[in-house]
Amino acid sequence: MLNFERKRIMGIYEILKSAHSGWRYLVIILLLVAFINALMGYLGKKPFTEGNRKLNVFALISSHIQLLLGLVLYFMNDWYKGDTAIAIQRYWKMEHIAMMVIAVVLITVGNARSKKGIDAAAKHRSIFLFFGLALIVITAAIINMVNIDPSRHLFGM
């Protein structure tokens, strides 16, 4: 019975890992599109439309789903028990999760501040600033992962 439970849990783990792996592309694309859209809106002095708001909310929601998937995987895989003296275990135990939480916080703050902006320029500026910072943090985490774990590359597992 115990072996069956372990296999079932590992099956769920693999499904969640695949979802987390695939969902990252949606998050990156939505963040990039929202960032570029906000930058063009700010520089072009364009109005902040309902479409802008929806794009930002979709980027926010997708990043929160990605974080939740990651947290479930983190605790299912026992990475939190890893030895921090070993670079790859330290990366997965501490660095990856910390950088992703920081990125999601930046996205959340940027979206919240854009709602409170008094004019279109302030709303666009909040999005391109905070989403841009989140993209920098995510990019740094990816580069760090590739450097620490040679079995991984920029666009794949």
Labelled PLM ranges:
Residues 2-157:
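Membrane-embedded alpha-helical bundles that constitute the cytochrome b-like, heme-associated redox core
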